[in-house]
Each structure stands twice: as C-alpha cells, then as structure tokens.
C-alpha cells in the first residue's frame, strides 16, 4: 500500500497517535515547464499535508517550491528519515537547512511527529473531507 518504508513508518506513528489521515488522496495540478500533478503522501484531518522523504532530490525540492507558489493555501510539511542529511555529497546545506531557508516545517521520522501537527481541535479541514480529485 505504501511506496516506501518511511511512509509506512509514518502511518504507524499516525495510527498510534489515533490521528485520522488519508494516504495519497489529493491531486494538485501545478505547472513546471509543463503541467504536472502532485499527490501528497498524507493529509491529516486538520488539513496538514505530510510529505515523507528518505531522499530529498533537487527535482523534489523544485517541485515543492512550485507547488507552494501555486497553492499557498496548503500547509505542506516534511517528515524526513534524516533531516541532517546533506543535499549534496560535498555540500554544507542539509535537508533541515533547506526547509528553514524556504520556511517549510519538518521533523525527523524517528523522533515522531510533533503533537501540535496532529491536533484537530474537533474540526475537519476542507482538504480532508473532499474526495480525491484532479482539481487544485
């Protein structure tokens, strides 16, 4: 069902914390040289989108900057296996540094997902309640 062990492990944390979520349940169209579609890994009941990454390659980083510029209403956050991993073999910038630079929230999967990310306050977001669609 899940495309990676990291996504599976993230789902286990969400289930353990009794957080309602949908897996790959939304299509966001965006333009990047040509029209593309993004399917988030997890959409939490509170509307937060979790994107789980073992590797965070250049194309993924570009994609998320394009998506955010075209869909600023969505709160996309990263769950990394290792946020301290370097973007490039001999580089200094880490995944965490990149997120800080571009103001994306992130966490380390092994440390669990921050509790404030999981809170719903009894409300379901519009993004969570709608059916999977191709509309952005």
What kind of region is each of these model predictions?
Residues 1-136:
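Nucleic-acid endo/exonuclease domains
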């Amino acid at each position: 069902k899940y495309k990676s062990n990291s996504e599976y492990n993230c789902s286990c944390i969400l289930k353990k914390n009794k957080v309602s979520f949908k897996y790959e349940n939304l299509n966001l169209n965006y333009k990047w040289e040509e029209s593309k579609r993004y399917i988030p890994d997890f959409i939490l009941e509170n509307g937060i989108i979790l994107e789980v990454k073992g590797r965070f390659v250049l194309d993924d980083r570009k994609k998320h900057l394009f998506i955010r510029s075209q869909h600023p209403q969505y709160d996309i956050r990263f769950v990394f296996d290792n946020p301290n991993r370097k973007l490039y073999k001999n580089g200094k910038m880490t995944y965490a540094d990149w997120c800080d630079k571009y103001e994306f929230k992130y966490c380390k999967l092994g440390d669990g997902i921050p509790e404030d990310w999981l809170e719903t306050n009894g409300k379901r977001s519009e993004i969570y309640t709608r059916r999977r669609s191709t509309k952005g």
